[in-house]
Each structure stands twice: as structure tokens, then as C-alpha cells.
């Protein structure tokens, strides 16, 4: 299996375990990370830590990669089933943020074996 995909699988595993430090070690110091709740991006490892710490006080997301595809320009797109529950494990109702149950495309750009950029797109599988 591709080493970059192994890195991404570890990131998903550590994210679902709420092991922020386990994820941050796989990111470059200057990472650009999509903010799925509010839009835009956060920049740097500590900003990613703050983003997830805030997110996990409001919702309980779980992300399950079901396929990976490397694009011609070297990015890796993961098709991901995203489920988001409230802190009691119940389905969300009436949320105003962008997180909800759906299948999405996570686009990763790696540099020297670490994630340098992460974006979110609507899932289009197989990728175009």
C-alpha cells in the first residue's frame, strides 16, 4: 500500500480516537486545514488543535474513509462517510454549522510524508 495512504489512514484512526497529538504529528508545521464548520481554513498545527478542541465541545464527528484516489497532480482524494452526532450520541437537529451526515471528498496534499494542505469537496466518486 502507498505510504501516503497509510499516513492518511492513521490520521483518520487517531481523529476518531480524539487523539489530537497523534494527528498533529502527521501534519506539517505550516499546514493549511479546511474548517468544515465555519468555512475557510485554519493555518498551522496549533490552529488545527484549537479548531478540533472547539468542534469536539459541540459535536461528536466520526469519519470513515471508504476509498482513496491519487490525482494526476499528486493530491490524494479520500471518499469519506462522515457522521456527526451531538455530545450524547444523538443525531443532530437544527444545527447552523456545516457539519452533518454525508459522504464527502477529503483532498490531501502531502509534503515529505506529512499533510501540508487539506480541503473538503462534495463527494464525486470516482473522482474526475
PLM regions and their residue ranges:
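A beta-strand edge to alpha-helix "cap/lid" segment located at domain peripheries
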Residues: 2-6, 53-128
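Short, low-complexity N-terminal intrinsically disordered segments enriched in polar/charged residues
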Residues: 1-29, 128
Amino acid at each position: 500500500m502507498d505510504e501516503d495512504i497509510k499516513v492518511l489512514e492513521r490520521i483518520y484512526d487517531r481523529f476518531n480516537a480524539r487523539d489530537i497529538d497523534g494527528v498533529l504529528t502527521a501534519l506539517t508545521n505550516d499546514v493549511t486545514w479546511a474548517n468544515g464548520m465555519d468555512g475557510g481554513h485554519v493555518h498551522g498545527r496549533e490552529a488545527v488543535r484549537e479548531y478540533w478542541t472547539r468542534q469536539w465541545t459541540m459535536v461528536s464527528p466520526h469519519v470513515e474513509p471508504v476509498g482513496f484516489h491519487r490525482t494526476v497532480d499528486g493530491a490524494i482524494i479520500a471518499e469519506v462517510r462522515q457522521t456527526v452526532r451531538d455530545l450524547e450520541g444523538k443525531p443532530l437537529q437544527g444545527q447552523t454549522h456545516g457539519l452533518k451526515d454525508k459522504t464527502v471528498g477529503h483532498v490531501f496534499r502531502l509534503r515529505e510524508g506529512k499533510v501540508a494542505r487539506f480541503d473538503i469537496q462534495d463527494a464525486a466518486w470516482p473522482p474526475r
